[in-house]
Swiss-Prot record:
It comes from the Eukaryota. One of its GO terms (molecular function) is cyclin-dependent protein serine/threonine kinase regulator activity. Keywords: Cell cycle, Cell division, Cyclin. SMART domains: CYCLIN. InterPro entries: Cyclin-like_dom, Cyclin-like_sf, Cyclin/Ssn8, Cyclin_N. The keyword Repeat does not apply. It holds the Pfam family Cyclin_N. Belongs to the cyclin family. Cyclin T subfamily. The gene is CYCT1-1. This is Putative cyclin-T1-1. One of its GO terms (biological process) is regulation of transcription by RNA polymerase II.
Length: 247
């Protein structure tokens, strides 16, 4: 089943009218929290040996949750753990709740949880899953830019350059998950920007097909392409550092 809800909004609406902003959290704090819980999810997914697609799904689910729920009322790390648990089931790489909770605690605190702490957190995840699913209206199947990037590179770039470009573009897609781009643009539009920046980083150029630029295949306008590229690159000049994880 394809995505059925319209989860996309403008950057202005996301930054000014999110539930967290309406509850008094300023933009810098909300951006910081997004960095923090997405970074946590990336590390958690890697520790669980989850595929990158599962990690990306967890991050998008978590970001979508906070378009409808406030950071003031929901602990972002707990929601993130729940989203990783759900994403594993959605993407065919399920892990028992206990495994997800145990590894999460190790990532957050760099030690094993006491038995009672473990059981409380596990119960919180299992009961909190209902709130997350309800908030997301069980709309859980997400298309990511990775396959779009890979298919286009295979068609358009010779093998030795293609591998280099594909990896560069994947890196930009992964990093973009720390921004709100997945709430603003579809996977094909994000894929086009990741390829565009990847081409520049790899010092590669592609000819236009007459008057049609290659990126028009991705249903993206030039203005959208520049906007996505700008936001991707802005990511690398943020004026804060994500701290050590912790609940």
């Amino acid at each position: 089943m394809a995505e059925t809800k319209n989860w996309y909004n403008t950057r202005e609406a996301i930054e000014k009218t999110s539930p967290s902003r309406l509850d008094g959290i300023n933009l810098k704090e909300e951006t910081f929290q997004r960095w923090s819980y997405t970074s946590f999810l990336q590390e958690l997914g890697q520790r669980l040996n989850n595929p990158q697609k599962t990690i990306a799904t967890a991050i998008v689910l978590c970001q979508r949750f906070f378009t409808r729920q406030s950071l003031t009322k929901n602990d972002p790390k707990t929601v993130a753990i729940i989203c990783m648990f759900i994403a594993g089931k959605v993407e065919g790489s399920p892990r028992p709740a206990g495994d997800v909770v145990f590894v999460s605690y190790r990532v957050l605190f760099n030690k094993e949880p006491l038995r009672d702490v473990f059981e409380r957190l596990k119960m919180t995840v299992l009961t909190g899953e209902k709130l997350v699913l309800s908030t997301l209206e069980c709309d859980l199947e997400i298309e990511h830019p990775y396959k779009l990037v890979m298919d286009w590179v295979k068609r358009s770039v010779k093998t030795e350059d293609g591998r280099r470009l594909c990896q560069a573009a994947f890196n930009f897609v992964n990093d973009s998950l720390r921004t709100s781009l997945c709430l603003q643009f579809g996977p094909s539009q994000i894929a086009s920007a990741a390829i565009y920046i990847g081409l520049s980083m790899c010092k590669m150029t592609l000819p236009c097909d007459g008057d049609k630029a290659w990126w028009r295949e991705f249903d993206v306008t030039k203005r959208q392409l520049w906007e996505i590229c700008d936001q991707m690159l802005d990511l690398y000049v943020q004026d804060f550092v994500v701290p050590r994880h912790g609940l």
